[in-house]
Amino acid sequence: MDLISVLPSTSKSCVCLHKPLSSSTHKLKPFCRTIRILGMPRPRKSVLMASSMSMSVNTLVSDDDIQRRTGGYHSNLWNDDVIQFLSTPYGELAYRERGERLIDEVREIFSSMSLEDGEFSDLIQRLWMVDNVERLGIDRHFKNEIKSALDYVYSYWSEKGIGCGTKSIITNLNSTALGFRTLRLHGYPVSADVLKHFRNQIGQFVSCPSETEEDIRSIVNLYRASLIAFPGEKVMEEAERFSEKYLKETLQKIPDCSLSREIGDVLEHGWHTNLPRLEARNYIDVFGQDTKNMESNRKTEKLLELAKLEFNIFQSIQKTELESLLRWWNDSGSPQITFTRHRHVEYYTLASCIAFEPQHSGFRLGFAKACHIITVLDDMYDLFGTVDELKLFTAAIKRWDPSATDCLPQYMKGIYMMVYNTVNEMSAEAQKAQGRDTLNYARQAWEVYLDSYMQEAKWIATGYLPTFEEYLENGKVSSGHRVSALQPMLTMDIPFPPHILKEVDFPSNLNDLACAILRLRGDTRCYQEDRARGEETSCISCYMKDNPGATEEDALNHLNVMISGVIKGLNWELLKPDSGVPISSKKINFDITRAFHYGYKYRDGYSVSSVETKSLVMRTLLEPVPL
């Protein structure tokens, strides 16, 4: 008999589903809590202890006499009062007008480079300007100037790199590493072999004995460049190992200063978890304290003032968007869904950290809503719902009709309508942006997503432990990356005609790798807590099944090697030359991957959002930059 049939069972026993999604693996606070569901639950608590930390899984009996599990998650950190009464003066016209004047003045700085820069520094000064406007988060205003500067640098690029200027006799590491990184990120075809010319006679990177600030900055830029590696680039791996070791040792020797803070930020966040708005916030502090800046004070002051002003002006936009998000959250009935995590503000913050252009409001709100829905569904399929209820819900989604709620349990009716209404609303927004109806395309993505949940429910119901390959293929879908990205992405002012969309969304390599890294990183961060909760299936357990005698350490080492390879593959899919797909079309899906990756940098930051994730909200959303 098929345990995942559509017809409901008459049994009232609860099958506790295991679904080791990266977004469903929970690192929990050490407490138990009874959660009221359906009016009058009769609590039965059980606590599972993990070796690394205390865990809690709450068991209760609801009004229908079904024993259910809840995760014991900490509550929503951001109530309506905190958000609704945020005030910022930076939405006023005077600040916007000052910003426009500063933009013009920075454009003049770009223009003056061709007149003022000597031929012994013209290349490095152009790279300095491009690098700094990007790190400060103000590059969207200077697209033409950036292209002109990089075209100029690339015209002097050689297989041995570049020097500081067009008349420089020899190349140097700082100019070449910074130039390589910047040119590659903008799609110029530059080879990593250029770095081989900075190794010694036995093929090793070596540091300069003098270790001046300029020498150290050269290694900082070498490290930053090494993170933009493509598959098979051994010299990039060597550069990363050397520069990371060097910079960690340097931090132990130099005093606290702007350079040490820059090194600390670069080492901590690297490239794949260095979200653009977070980088801007951190770099504003570093840039403003760098008294030995190689450029004149005039350039530094203008860039810094514009970066601070832009950062704060955007917070006034965020306040308006947060008010809209909270209305949706309340109107959708989300506060009444008490068994789930409420992380809508955190998801909005992640969206704001990767797409902070004012016109991308639809993306930011859509991403927050989609991720909230995914979290509710995740907790429902993973913990709270019975197999029979979940079969009904999955079938109802495929009907896509409000009347389908007639066959659902009461607690599922509101969840169904939240999915139905929000997906329809996002499709309407996408139609405005793309000029075509994408609802059926979006529905198909959600259906496949829920089918992957049900596959995992079938595995747990039958006690089946899949092979690693079988688990990963299904887990890439159940990770939720595709449904979190698809509709928000289509609301942007970036054209996604069908031939472009298939290179960004399913079945593209970019989408496959993005889903893979979310599954792999999620499992490596959360498998111990899942296992302590009685959920055995993960990348780690499946690998150990396929490789008898392998230890957990063996499995983790294998997965970390896989993750490193996936990251390089993502770099290639984003930046490969002559792909026929603009980098701008691929970048948002790539950046969504970076956002999710950030959430798993230290822990499961979606279940335990009260540490690093809370700090991200405070630093990028709630706290203005002092002018």
UniProtKB/Swiss-Prot annotation:
Pfam families: Terpene_synth, Terpene_synth_C
Compartmental location: Plastid, Chloroplast
Residues involved in Mg(2+) 2 binding: 378, 382
Domain of life, source organism: Eukaryota
Transit peptide: 1-50
Enzyme Commission number, as recorded: 4.2.3.120, 4.2.3.119
Entry note: cofactor: Binds 3 Mg(2+) or Mn(2+) ions per subunit.
GO CC annotation: chloroplast
Cofactor requirements of the protein: Mg(2+); Mn(2+)
Entry binding sites for Mg(2+) 3: 530
Pathway: Terpene metabolism; oleoresin biosynthesis; Secondary metabolite biosynthesis; terpenoid biosynthesis
Keyword Membrane annotated: no
Example GO molecular function: pinene synthase activity
Protein's name in the database: (-)-beta-pinene synthase 1, chloroplastic
Annotated source species: Pinus contorta (Shore pine)
